[in-house]
Amino acid sequence: MTESRWYSTSPPAKLNLFLELLARRDDGFHELDTVMVAIDWRDELHVRRTTNPGVQLSVDWTDGRTSVAAELQVDEDNELLLVPTDDKNLVVRALNRLTETLRLDGGWEVQLNKNIPSGAGMGGASSDAASALQLGWAAARETQSDLPETLKNETLLSLAAEIGSDVPFFLGDLQADRLVQCAHATGRGEKLNFFTLANPLHAVVIYPAASVSTAQVYSRCQVPDSPQSSNELLRALQGIAAESEFSLHNALQAPARGLSSRIDPALECLSKAGLTHCHMTGSGSACFALADSSQQAAIAAETLRSTFPGGALIRPVMSCVVPSEIHIA
């Protein structure tokens, strides 16, 4: 085989606008009712096929490790900045599984530039994995022209669900071949009903220099007797009901607050900044609040950078489409 060109994209993060536990499954997971929106806090991923077997992954921080460490007020070797380059990284796992499934020769060279923090509940690792599958498929098609394009959707969706519950969301609506920003997810998060937002969503996100274990958060959860429903939120986001009628919810927020003392200050500061619907995303520790406009979000984020107690990554964000555009060099 010959080496392919470089394929690149910008994997986005996500926010859980709603997350409720419906039941505990026999496989250890929970049945969920969750609403996810992709946001423009992005990593950068570059992939190409090589003649050398395996996945050679290089990782760096886009803004530089020194700069990010200064924002977080931690040392440069702090675990918050450490990103694995072996099969603990979902990018490596995704490309290895793609190689096995398609029976490809050779391997992969990958450059991952991080912006999305780990242990934040923002789906950064899952988004990177989904993008790796998309880029890997495109690169494989370049060097193996007999690879049927008709197998793409089935293959990528199957591998994505195998790699992680959030990974299929970041592939977007492959079946309908359309760009979307939002999805209502059920099952363990892999059963997706995609939709387009009636209006762009603006928010401010705080990652309060703390990583929270997803497994520990879920282990402290209890399934409510009367779960809340996402129906009103879904209607509002799609423009079917007035936006003033919706409320956000995260069943994981209370147990996560018990695991990290950094979550409460983030929620409190977001509320004091004049933003609305302050909540944690996913299993934490990142928290967010909604803004009326990109200008309000930018002003609030700037204020929070000077008032938040301790280190944090604070960003104004807005909704974006999935999947991200692929570039070839």
Swiss-Prot record:
Biological or metabolic pathway of the protein: Isoprenoid biosynthesis; isopentenyl diphosphate biosynthesis via DXP pathway; isopentenyl diphosphate from 1-deoxy-D-xylulose 5-phosphate: step 3/6
Catalytic residues (UniProt): 14, 166
An example molecular function term from Gene Ontology annotations: ATP binding
EC class of the enzyme, as a word: transferase
InterPro entries registered for this protein in UniProt: GHMP_kinase_C_dom, GHMP_kinase_C_sf, GHMP_kinase_N_dom, IspE, Ribosomal_Su5_D2-typ_SF, Ribsml_uS5_D2-typ_fold_subgr
EC numbers on record: 2.7.1.148
UniProt: ATP binding residues: 117-127
Pfam families to which the protein is assigned, alphabetical: GHMP_kinases_C, GHMP_kinases_N
Biological process, per Gene Ontology: isopentenyl diphosphate biosynthetic process, methylerythritol 4-phosphate pathway; terpenoid biosynthetic process
Record keywords, A-Z: ATP-binding, Isoprene biosynthesis, Kinase, Nucleotide-binding, Transferase
The family this protein is said to belong to: Belongs to the GHMP kinase family. IspE subfamily.
Function recorded in the entry: Catalyzes the phosphorylation of the position 2 hydroxy group of 4-diphosphocytidyl-2C-methyl-D-erythritol.
PANTHER family, per the entry: 4-DIPHOSPHOCYTIDYL-2-C-METHYL-D-ERYTHRITOL KINASE, CHLOROPLASTIC (PTHR43527:SF2)
Name of the protein this chain belongs to: 4-diphosphocytidyl-2-C-methyl-D-erythritol kinase
Gene source species: Rhodopirellula baltica (strain DSM 10527 / NCIMB 13988 / SH1)
